[in-house]
Amino acid sequence: FLPLVTGLLSGLL
């Protein structure tokens, strides 16, 4: 779950 969230955040940033 964490890796997915970090991936989304990095994508948004």
Curated annotation (Swiss-Prot):
Protein's cellular compartments: Secreted; Target cell membrane
Primary location: secreted
Keywords recorded for this protein, A-Z: Amidation, Amphibian defense peptide, Antibiotic, Antimicrobial, Immunity, Innate immunity, Membrane, Secreted, Target cell membrane, Target membrane
Leucine amide: residues carrying this PTM: L13
ATP-binding recorded as keyword: no
Tissue: Expressed by the skin glands.
Ranges in a coiled coil: none
GO cellular component: extracellular region; membrane; other organism cell membrane
Disulphide bridges: none
A GO biological process held by the record: defense response to bacterium
Superkingdom field: Eukaryota
Protein family (similarity comment): Belongs to the frog skin active peptide (FSAP) family. Temporin subfamily.
Protein function: Antibacterial peptide. Has activity against the Gram-positive bacterium S.aureus (MIC=64 uM) and the Gram-negative bacterium E.coli (MIC>128 uM). Has no hemolytic activity (LC(50)>300 uM).
Name assigned to this protein: Temporin-1CSc
